Amino acid sequence: RLIKQSNKNNNIKIKKPFTITLDPGHGGLDPGAVRYSYREKDITLLAAKELKGLLEKKGYKVFLTRNKDEFISLRKKKNIAKKNSSDLFISIHVDSVKKKSTRGTSIYTLSDKASDKVTAMLAERENKVDLIAGIDKEVDNEVFSILLDLQRRDTKNASASFAEIYVNKVRNNGYRALRRPHRQAGFAVLKSPDIPSVLVELGFLSNPKDAKYLSNKKSRARVLKALSEAIFDYVKTRSKI
C-alpha cells in the first residue's frame, strides 16, 4: 500500500509505503495481566507478529516495538514509531478487571479528559509500567503543549477516525465488543504529536472465554482480521486527503 507524500523542495507528490508500528503491550519484567496461566505480554507479542504478517502480505511496511520478551519504555516505543516515519501506531493489549463477566474488545484514543472512570484507571495503570523498570516519570512540557493546543489537530482526528472504523469492522465480523468500545484517556504511549495512535484491548484475560479465545491462534485470528480490515479501510480514507 502506497500513500502520497509531498516533497518540501518542489512540492511533487511522491509515493511511499504506508508504515505501521505495532506495539505488543508489556514485556520482560512487566508481564501485564496474568490470569489462568496466561500472560498478557505473551498474547500481545503473538498477536502483533500475526498481524504484522497479515499486513505485510498486503504490501504495508510494519515495525514492532519488540520482537521478543523484553521491556521497552513508553518513551522508547514512541521514538521507534517516529524513527520509522510511521503513519499509524497501534498498541496491542489484553485487559483484566475484577468482574469476570466483562468481555470483548475496545479501542482507546488520546484525550486530556478520560471518557469514564474505568478508562481513567486503565490509563493510569498503563502509564505506570515504566516505574516497574525503575524509570522515573519525566516532566514533559511537550506533552502539556500537545494536550493544550492539540498540535497537529489532524493527528487526533485521524486516530478517532481509525477507532470508529475498527468498531464497525468488529461489529461486521460478529466479534464481541464492550458496550461503548471507543473510549478516551491520557495514555502516555499515544502522545505522539504527529502520528495517529490508538491502543487496542483485544479482550479480557479475566474472562475465561476471552482468555481461552485469545490464547488460541485460530480463534485469535478473528479479531486480528477485524483489525487488519480496519487498517485497510483507514488507509483508503487517508489516501483521499
Where are these regions (language model features)?
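Active-site-adjacent mobile loop/cap segments within catalytic or ligand-binding domains
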Residues: 21, 148-241
